[in-house]
Amino acid sequence: MRYLTAGESHGPGLTTIIEGLPAGMPLLAEDVNKELKRRQGGHGRGARMRIEKDQVQITAGIRHGKTLGAPVAMFVENKDWKHWETVMSIEPVPEKNEKSRRVSRPRPGHADLVGGMKYGHNDMRNVLERSSARETTVRVAAGAVAKKLLHELGIEVAGHVLEIGGTRANLKRDYAVSEIQETSEASPVRCLDEVAAEEMMQKIDDAKKNGDTIGGIVEVVVGGVPAGLGSYVQWDKKLDAKIARAIVSINAFKGAEFGVGFEAARKPGSEVMDEILWSKEDGYTRRTNNLGGFEGGMTNGMPIVVRGVMKPIPTLYKPLQSVDIDSKETFNASVERSDSCAVPAASVVAEAVVAWEVAVAVLEKFDGDRFDTLKKHVEEHRNLTKEF
């Protein structure tokens, strides 16, 4: 299974096409729209979210509420397009049109300058329109489809915010996926710790007042995962590696870790490895989950636990120094409408990309042509691994 996305931040809209879904899987527009709505929430979002009320249009691949096995095409309209029709016109416009909003002062930390160099754009709007995090709208749409597939197979995905601006949630125990879903949805910053959430919101407000931005850490947990997804036989078949790549591919994300993550470097092996248990009711389990649900690049039946770190958004209302590409003189960087903190929304994007990679791994392991046979094969596999 694979997907492609297309579209610019202020263009007519965003498109994604998914290929490889099994036939007969239940899927409605509302399954996607509820995820799009979650992405638009969170304390610290900018004015754009008051304009865009994202709704998906499914234009191919589904009939009477079920997938056909053909490519599924989805489109999300940009409501703000009406204000950008000249700037983002498909047809040519006069080169010196006053509405062109040409960008010649690249923003530090963005794709602007290097993207302009790479593709020969002397107007870096050609770069920033595509590199914008607005593209994650349709990544969340694709992830919503993956989450629906996993849900039907008894696999659930939940994300939450662990840290913002140096304030970290004080979590004294592991949370079930259902608990994470319920508690994070009730929080303006998608945090499970109410005390930390209040401090996070204050830090976001302070950053906004100062024309600054802050980043943080999100965590995604996947429960009900069967053992044996991914493989150890080749480096590029390891599922944890694929998930790490997906996490770091999200705009502004700079790292990923599983389980205890980088803390493993500070602990002896006896405190890191997860002891193996067996019971007639549950089959093989682990006493702990320090490895985040992976051994040898494969799922081991424990929940997948992955975290991603997001840098502060590089668009600052108190802009940093840059250089004008025309005059080569020093100026303050260009300012585009942006958020002061997008970490809560990014947790929803992280859910989407993790769900996608797990769904792909499921379809790689089991028959993916028909959804009814897929469900049957997953259940048979669960029984086989339990009795091993």
UniProtKB/Swiss-Prot annotation:
This is Chorismate synthase. It catalyses: 5-O-(1-carboxyvinyl)-3-phosphoshikimate = chorismate + phosphate. Keywords: Amino-acid biosynthesis, Aromatic amino acid biosynthesis, FAD, Flavoprotein, FMN, Lyase, NADP. Belongs to the chorismate synthase family. CDD domains: Chorismate_synthase (cd07304). Pathway: Metabolic intermediate biosynthesis; chorismate biosynthesis; chorismate from D-erythrose 4-phosphate and phosphoenolpyruvate: step 7/7. It comes from Listeria innocua serovar 6a (strain ATCC BAA-680 / CLIP 11262). Pfam families: Chorismate_synt. Homotetramer. Reduced FMN (FMNH(2)). Residues 95-118 are annotated as: Disordered.
